Amino acid sequence: MYPDGLCKLDDHTWSKCIEFEDVNYQLAKPDDQTAIFEALCDMYNAHDASIGMQLSLVSRRMNREDFVKRIEIAAQGDHFDHIRELYTQMLRKQLERGNNGLIKTKYLTLTIEARDSKTARARFSRIVMDALNHFKVMGALAKELGGKEWLEMLHGILHPDGERFAFEWSWLAPSGLSVQDFIAPSSFRFGEARKFTMADKFCAVSFLQISAPEMDDRMLTELLDTDSGLLVSLHIRSMDQNEAIKTVKRKITDIDSMKIDAQKKAVREGFDMDIIPTDLATYAGEAKNILRDLQSRNERMFLMTFLVVNFSDSKQKLENDLLRAASVAQKYNCSLVRLDFQQEDGFVSALPLGVNRIKIQRGLTTSAVAVFVPFTTQKIFHGGEALYYGLNATSGNMILADRKKLKTPNGMILGTPGSGKSFSAKRSIVGVFLNTKDDILICDPEAEYFPLVNRLEGQVIKISPTSTQYVNPMDINLNYSEDDNPLALKSDFILSFCELAAGGRNGLEPVEKTVIDRAVRIVYRPYIADPRPENMPLLEDLYDEIKRQPEPEAQRIAAALELYVHGSLNVFNHRTNVDINNRIVCFDIKELGKQLKSLGMLVIQDQVWNRVSQNRDQGKSTWYFVDEFHLLLRGEVGSWSVEIWKRFRKWGGIPTGITQNIKDLLSSPEIENIFENSDFVYLLNQASGDRKILCERLNISNQQAAHISNAGPGEGLIFFGNVILPFADDFPKDNELYSIMTTKLGETGKGENEHE
């Protein structure tokens, strides 16, 4: 093995290995499945008889310590260590429910003959690049393995329980050891005919005997769906096209000869000469079909060896695993046959090295080989600040996603009432709080979030006509805009505010907008000159300044604003008197009346923008969760929401809209921009009308749509950039966090005032 990933198998044989990731094949639309299948055919056809291919699919356990380390949240000696422990308990329990730490990896090993390493490298540079391009067409991320990565992969197969791999190239010369010494298990024993042991594992190698007239693309997926270690290897080598055609023609000639003999025998015995053995007629038809495929349908002939290695903890478990694998093969009219007295050769041949010592080969055309599609479903398992979003409903893999990796991290949580929208948002809030240092802001129209916010020692701001908690809509920080004039954007907000307060049916007239803009610039002069809190203007200052303007329109605006300054709706004419800088701030607007609801939501949007612009200079992200998001999509509030959705990404803002009203989301081209500017969509159960709209908008296949039809709470589809995964999140009800986050009657309230 060379450091650059070139492997020397013998004096003239060399190999290279490519690791490729999964794509969403099983749940894709039929057209997309066909495109992947055709791309796979093209890749096989691109390799001539001088290139050996080995497709290896590995299912093994990840190192338990490493796996747990990626999901555990370390204690920090503060009030929230108990919550960290509860959250980690939940993640551990979900891990046990899922695939229990099994990871599935996929490799393509390419083998050529060359006289020396220089010649091999030169030839592999083109071959590997072509293969990577073919995977790109399929939508699969792929990379060429370096020598150390390849050794680590082999070490993982030879140590199925996930022992740690330790190796450096600089260790070889001083130690006198070879690379084999660093990857080999403690022992092998090949003394038995039908199985062998590798360290403390009981193993068996079988080959697939293909007797089905047609294969199914689900067979590999079902074969790999196991809770034990498994290695599936397909050795594939193309035949020379002319030689393949000659071989098939010879077979047809042989069959015709046998047919003539059978006819002669029938005539001698007094039977009709057209009555020939059924098998002969079948073989003749199949051979002619193969010849036609080779000559006119862009098919090639391949020789394939299909090997399966089972790894188990006990003899009984091995027998059970073998029976399960055999039943899968039987389901598709194939047989899984043990390699008697060839266990060692079979195991060496199954390892992703490009070596094939098993001479049991089956001739198949390109389409027949490509039907063994190595793809099932993608995975999202990020490290660092990734949040938990459930378990992959297809593979059982835990979904850990970091939205900051997306081009546009804006998100939507969509679902019918009772599908788990608010619960999913609260689970995300806890994840953000524990996994990051980011700030969290919540717009809460139904007063659902205060138990969680109180538990996390956040600030709940109750905005209502009778509340004594105030937020000043005139608050501004000098970083409010990305240019040097923060007043331009603030003036735009105040115009929207006045539009709602004084605009009437037809909105503000141009002259009225001019008056307001002039007054805004005047009232902010003292604060811009000396930015102290006591110099921050109030709505009353704006009202007084507008009254001083000479235009007649100014008096009309002032008269309309009087209700919000000196009248009964003067909740927004006070200085901010709450901790707006707490890490978690929840704006409770449930008791805002109809007159103030839109104004209240607009003021919250502005406060959020203040916080986002302030945090940007500190290099901190700001998460903004908006429940009942459809309420923010109308009129001036809607325009401001669209503006925020566009601007947030550049400023480190990560907004999440939560709603069941899909039709409101798509009510106008402007509002549609919010949907199109969201690379994260968390789809829970959908009503039939909304489901139809979403399937068209998001290009959802029928198989995927099944996961949002009559789905249980916490089940659906997650859209993460270009990745679509079905998920299920059955949050443990015995976890204390559940009672803080649920909105179900009878299950809420427990622990909401507890503090450590």
Indicate where each model-derived feature is located.
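Extended, folded cores of ATP/NTP-driven motor/assembly subunits in large transport
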Residues: 1-377
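Conserved lysine of the Walker
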Residues: 421
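Hydrophobic positions on the alpha1 helix immediately C-terminal to the Walker A/P-loop
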Residues: 424
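A short helix-turn-beta junction within AAA+ P-loop NTPase domains corresponding to the substrate/partner-engaging
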Residues: 457-461, 670-683
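Conserved P-loop NTPase
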Residues: 698-754
